[in-house]
Amino acid sequence: ALAVLATMLMGAVATAHAKDCAGATPLPADGTITPPAGDGSADLARFSGTWGGTWTARGGGDGPCGVLVVEDVFANGFARVVYSTGVADPLIAQPQAWRASGRVVDGVLRFELPLSWRPEATYRFAGNDLAGTFKDFATDATTTAVRIADLRRVACPRLPPVASPSGASRDRIVAAEMLSPSTRPGGLVHNDYFMPIGTTTPARHALRGTLTIHDAKISHAHDGCAGLDVPAAGLTAAVFTRGEHLVPAVRTIIRPPGSRAGLILSPGRVWSEPGDRGMSRASFPYVVVDETSNGARNGLATFLFDDTRVSNLRVQVSQETMEWSRDDFWGQAPMTYAPGPIADEARLRTEFDAERRLETPMKPWSALPASKTTRWLDAFDGDAVPDDISANGVVIDGVLYVKTCHTRAGPYPYCRQMRHGVFSVTKTLGAAVALLRLAQKYGDGVFDLKIEDYVRVTATHDGWRDVTFADALSMSAPVGDLGPRRDWPQPDPDENKPKFYEWLEARTAQQKLDRGFTYGRYPWPRGEVVRYNSVVTFTLAAAMDAYLKQKAGPGAHLWDMVVDEVYRPLGIFHEPTMHMLEADGSRGIPLLGYGLTPTIDDVAKLTTLLQQGGRHDGVQLLSAAKLAEALYRTSATGLSVLRRSRYGDYRYHLSFWSVPYVTEPRLRFLIPFMSGYGGNFVVLLPNGISAFRFADGNTGDIETMILAGEAIRPFCTSAPAGAPPQGSGAAPGGGGVGGG
């Protein structure tokens, strides 16, 4: 999917200047060009300003307009730029823009886009114009960019901002719009329009049957700049009403035929409004997930219904954990309804009642039980930009305190049901939980089992020899291509590289394993150096699944065990995750290196389980000894990843990162946390509090979350039963700690 997107970023484009690029590209509303200071050279100052043209790929064809805005250029050659592209039907449906930093060296301005695969652009002068190149693993394109005097000429017209309902009656998404086959929504509306407005009453009708959503064209935009309509594949879903709730019968990933995207439907609401022509109204939240990555887009849907018919379905998407494609979608799709029985209906109704009964209590951020007002509660998110954050908060003594459930169209009205693509947080909430459950069932010795005894290793080297389940979970298998020195400055040199993206595209388990085993061998033994790679976690998932089948029979499935024996006892009845799709269409093994889309309610339940040592309602669900080790509550401290915090090295062990922290009484802790691509964090604090932030702005500092948690409840006082032990010892003098 990312390789496809990379191609779309530049595409195959026409001869430079062949199209009118006026109003074709999005530009930041706060964009400004600062005249170069007098202490810089004239050669550097020439780059300042706005430049535009169209791109030409090696293969020819029509493609996008491109705009470069050099906002600042400094005397040392560093520059701040905005890079923007328009649409090119049919390959590039969405204009996009990025801010980036670059540098002019030997007359060439070079910068990388802030995307995981780091595509590179260069510009150099060719007469009075700029000759540009764009390169990544999928694209090689050139352009001739001319100077544009007026920045406003190239900026696309912005869609109007959303506004919340202003009166006591509905003036958006009204019945006439919903019932008309020709309605074309003009853009996003405020999320409140998907919920009851004005005087409402209980639903006049009930739903029990099958909804069929038909194929449609959906509009979309990036940063208020409209793109081309895109096709949305239809699907069929059984639903029923339960009191004021609308409940989908299937809560796993639904993949419409021929679509690379999947959908997860969640429970919504039903009610009646006086202007709905005697019909009832429903809305529900859903999430769109990708076929190969863990990106997730949160949407809302609404429709009218009576006992026999439904209106069109109005949908919109206005938030995501998908930093490479932060776009809005909206539209209306035809829909039909067939009343009738639902398979396993009695169980589904009973299960939904239990799900609601076991919901984690939720309170607003303002209700935090802090002992005194502190700046750290306000600074909880550190340098994370609010628009980048989907949801954030803390879990205290089994209660959720939520700071925000944010979208670009207003607060998400189904905050509890909002799902988040958490990427590598899955390595803990998926892979580690699975191995800890196996250890509780079959003994802690499963951590010492060898990968090669359960997976056919096709590597041409001995790097996998004697690698244990624990080594794989700790990312200390001596396997990889890049970062060949022990002192390599980044622990994940192979992630987000061309070979990794080829591995992502593999559909079946065997294809994925075979591609993973093409990685080379490092010159050190297992268990000594962290080389973080999701390929290793997937190999562990395959080994764990094979081990479970050996113990429980060929019909056993690793993720079913996790859901049935860990998640469901906690009250998490639905936790869809990404699986391999085998050649016969059957569900394969779970990926577990990424793929989970948890809600904040799920996170509250799971972090509470971890904070309580793997015990729930008097039953030990996870191995207590191995969980304590994973949470840095024993003498085991894992391996340094050669990244420093102000108190020492970050470390990694059994899927948990840790950062050293020293309290004011000079007690030293290793704070365990989970980290996922884009800025997804779950932090387990030593006072029993857990903090979370799901975002896609690539911000990585969690210290403000730790400081806020300590402000709520000091780390050096007694925590509730089941919370971790207190400080692990006094820190040495000098204000810092060494070596983790």
Language-model features, listed with the residues they occupy:
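A short, well-structured edge-of-sheet supersecondary motif
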Residues: 304, 369-414, 682, 690-691
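Active-site-adjacent helix/loop patches that line small-molecule binding or acyl-intermediate pockets
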Residues: 367-392, 460-572, 600-604, 609-612
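Active-site helix/loop module of the DD-peptidase/beta-lactamase fold
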Residues: 159-183, 192, 440-480, 518-523, ...
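Central antiparallel beta-sheet cores of small beta-barrel/beta-sandwich binding domains
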Residues: 19-153
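Active-site SXXK
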Residues: 421-446, 472, 540-544, 603-606, ...
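Active-site Gly/Thr loop motif
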Residues: 574-581, 632-694
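Noncatalytic N-terminal accessory/assembly modules of large enzymes
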Residues: 154-298
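Active-site-proximal alpha-helical segments within enzyme catalytic domains
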Residues: 432, 535-546, 594-616, 680-696
